[in-house]
């Protein structure tokens, strides 16, 4: 039986861990050096609920320089991974300020999974010290859940690409969301306006 094809687009602030999450999931290796993304595509096979799904993973650049290029990724998207970094409260703030309006404009009705990346840094001493200098602290799980409710996300998950904790669960939830969206009719596909 042929695999069902679904398209996943990942968005979020620059350096919040999007590319690492995709690479760890699709290639099972953690990239040690940071290279800002312009436009990358990966394909990964995943099985959920005894369905074979071929997931086209579309990486995007979070930097503002790419705000005009990013919408080229959106047409025909089945599910969005909207990411922030647990060690960056500012990246969580950009979820309702920047990412939700952009995604809901180009992809109305496409399910959104809110993902807290870099979970391993929540209890990291160096991270905590650096954030304290700015009178901040790592994002708490309940803050992520509250944000997911606020933006009407399909779900909220936390993961660490570095330790691989929670990575598979993110893509399983995303695949389930994409499969469910199909049942509501193909009218949900993203439009390029």
From Swiss-Prot:
CDD domains: RhoA_like
GO CC terms: plasma membrane
Positions of modified residues (Cysteine methyl ester): 190
Keywords, in A-Z order: Cell membrane, Glycoprotein, GTP-binding, Lipoprotein, Membrane, Methylation, Nucleotide-binding, Prenylation
Subcellular compartments: Cell membrane
Swiss-Prot/TrEMBL GO biological process terms: actin filament organization; signal transduction; skeletal muscle satellite cell migration; small GTPase-mediated signal transduction; wound healing, spreading of cells
Listed GO MF terms: GTP binding; GTPase activity
Chain positions listed as propeptide in the UniProt record: 191-193
Entry keyword annotation includes GTP-binding: yes
Family: Belongs to the small GTPase superfamily. Rho family.
Protein name: Rho-related GTP-binding protein RhoA-A
Origin organism lineage: Eukaryota, Metazoa, Chordata, Craniata, Vertebrata
Primary gene name: rhoaa
